[in-house]
């Protein structure tokens, strides 16, 4: 994958810290998700956006808190997230109902507290990140490259049987596991 522009990545991290601080100040539970959650554990840098997981009942309040802090809110047509734009148009996704099921107290409790870019925060487990990404694969979005890169860079840290078990109903997940096993990135299923 091409190298991520350092300035853009720095802007993502700054936006993550600002948004996280705003949500903390508002008393909203959240966890870092997506590509930045993987990066926080040694995965590749991301160039897309900042994914913050919040419970469905907190999503609108979280977006309002970000708006009050100067971020530009947006309500997309998808019914599983809200958005806000930070400085330099960095996109903050407030995800409350990702593939794999809505964000719950259990999801947030499973997240580990880590120091990311000099800020303590909850970071979603890699298994949860991968479940969400693998279940998002579809006929319209069949790109395996990012989930292959995550598997390659973080394979030793992932409970692959957990990810398999939670994604087994998806034909795209079956294709993904066939591929990563054939490439010897991930061990074959232990069942």
Question: What name fits each language-model region?
Answer:
Residues 1-191:
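Compositionally biased terminal segments of proteins
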């Amino acid at each position: 994958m091409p190298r991520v522009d350092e300035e853009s990545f720095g802007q993502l991290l700054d936006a993550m810290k600002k948004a996280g601080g705003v949500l903390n100040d508002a008393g909203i539970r959240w966890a870092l998700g997506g590509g930045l959650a993987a990066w926080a554990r040694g995965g590749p840098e991301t160039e897309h956006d900042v994914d913050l997981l919040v419970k469905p009942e907190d999503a609108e309040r979280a977006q309002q808190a970000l708006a009050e802090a100067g971020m530009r809110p947006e309500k997309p047509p998808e019914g599983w997230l809200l958005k806000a734009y930070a400085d330099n148009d960095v996109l903050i996704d407030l995800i409350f109902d990702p593939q794999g099921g809505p964000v719950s107290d259990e999801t947030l409790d499973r997240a580990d507290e880590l120091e990311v870019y000099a800020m303590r925060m909850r970071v979603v487990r890699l298994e949860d990140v991968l479940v969400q990404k693998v279940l998002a694969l579809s006929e319209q979005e069949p790109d395996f490259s990012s989930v292959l890169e995550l598997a390659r860079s973080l394979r030793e840290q992932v409970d692959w049987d957990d990810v398999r078990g939670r994604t087994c109903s998806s034909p795209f997940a079956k294709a993904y596991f066939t591929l990563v096993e054939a490439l010897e990135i991930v061990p074959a299923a232990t069942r």
